[in-house]
Amino acid sequence: MHRIAIIGSGNICRHILNSLLATQALRDKFKLAVLARSHQPATPLPEHADVFTDIDAVLAWQPDLVVEAASQGAVREYGEKCLKAGVSFLITSAGALADTELAAGLTAHAQAGGCRIIIPSGAIGGLDYIQGAARFPGAEIAYESRKPPAAWLPELEAMGIAPAAVSEPIVLFSGPASEAAVRYPKNLNVAATLAQAGVGMTATQVQVIVDPQSPGNQHVIHVKSAAGTFSLSIVNKPSPDNPKTSWIVAENIVATTCRYFSPLAL
């Protein structure tokens, strides 16, 4: 039985738990635990998951994999300790790795601990192509994020713009992924994931657009290299519980987790 600990007790955590506990066959395959702020989270968790409030207790539980499903802060707070203990660490808040010192430190701890850092593709696809294209000198990668105003309420309010008054697309940001991931830690983990797969945080160009006509959370990726060109457009439905996050993200994490333990990896 594989032991998986999840950091965070919010929407993504609950979705992961429900998926991995959906059938008796899955419950026989996975033993699950959650690191939460309280033994009784505000939203109840499935009864088959153990709940801890201390990372040392989680590691004493001897997980095979720790899944961060909380925030960039959780990556900084818990990543090093898990990797030093020899436990592989799956990072959903990939924007934390825009901190190059943190990224280098976590990588060194993973190497020393004989374990791995895993970054799921999250809301996008095509990372296998991007990894190959990035091996060609001069490869270029550009990413455009388009989300409806509901995904950017605090940002619009800070600009003095009423979300209901947005009638035309607004460019919130244009620049490197390194800056985008830090400026928008809850919305642009995709940019950091692309950068890790491709040409790096500084070279990956990002444009962030608030679009009242967007049918969902839209991700547009353009890649150009000596091997050819590649364009991908994805329109994801927002999570019913969190419009900042695409609905597909949690299931992608589940798929990545299952692949980690599978004898056949795609």
Predicted stretch roles:
Residues 94-115:
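Rossmann-fold NAD(P)-binding glycine/threonine-rich loop
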Residues 25-45:
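NAD(P)-binding Rossmann-fold cofactor-contacting core
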Residues 7, 15, 118, 123-266:
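Active-site-lining helix/loop region of Rossmann-like oxidoreductase modules
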Residues 12:
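Hydrophobic/small residue at the entry helix of a nucleotide-binding pocket
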Residues 88-90:
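A short hydrophobic/small-residue beta-strand
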Residues 55-57, 61-84, 96-100:
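Beta-loop-alpha module in the N-terminal Rossmann-like domain of NAD(P)-dependent dehydrogenases
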Residues 1-5:
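Extreme N-terminal starter segment of soluble prokaryotic enzymes
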Residues 15, 19-29:
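A short, Lys/Arg-enriched amphipathic alpha-helix followed by its capping loop at the start of a domain
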